[in-house]
Amino acid sequence: MLTVNEYFDGKVKSVAFQSSTLPATIGVISAGEYEFGTSEKETMTVVSGELTVLLPGQQDWQTFGAGESFEVAGQASFKAKTDADTAYLCTYG
């Protein structure tokens, strides 16, 4: 079954589903800057657009474009910002 999630007053929306290997969400982040928390390891892949992130323990922001991925450990938080709508796929575990 699909579960729709909405965060930051509707500026981030995702649909949760079970991929062939791991639980996942696919969603869109609207222009802005956000801070996300993780409960378990997440691998985030940019599908369309560009996402600039500040990963835990890092001092420099990194930019990821379509087809690029980054990982965040569980029980952590990271910041993300974008200038335009950006689509992503996130797998958990």
Swiss-Prot record:
Top EC group: transferase
EC number: 2.4.2.1, 2.4.2.2
Domain of life: Bacteria
Short name of one Pfam family: Ppnp
Keyword list, A-Z: Glycosyltransferase, Transferase
Any one Gene Ontology molecular-function term assigned to this protein's record: thymidine phosphorylase activity
Family statement drawn from the similarity comment of this UniProt entry: Belongs to the nucleoside phosphorylase PpnP family.
Function: Catalyzes the phosphorolysis of diverse nucleosides, yielding D-ribose 1-phosphate and the respective free bases. Can use uridine, adenosine, guanosine, cytidine, thymidine, inosine and xanthosine as substrates. Also catalyzes the reverse reactions.
Protein name: Pyrimidine/purine nucleoside phosphorylase
Species the sequence originates in: Marinobacter nauticus (strain ATCC 700491 / DSM 11845 / VT8)
Gene transcribed to yield this protein: ppnP
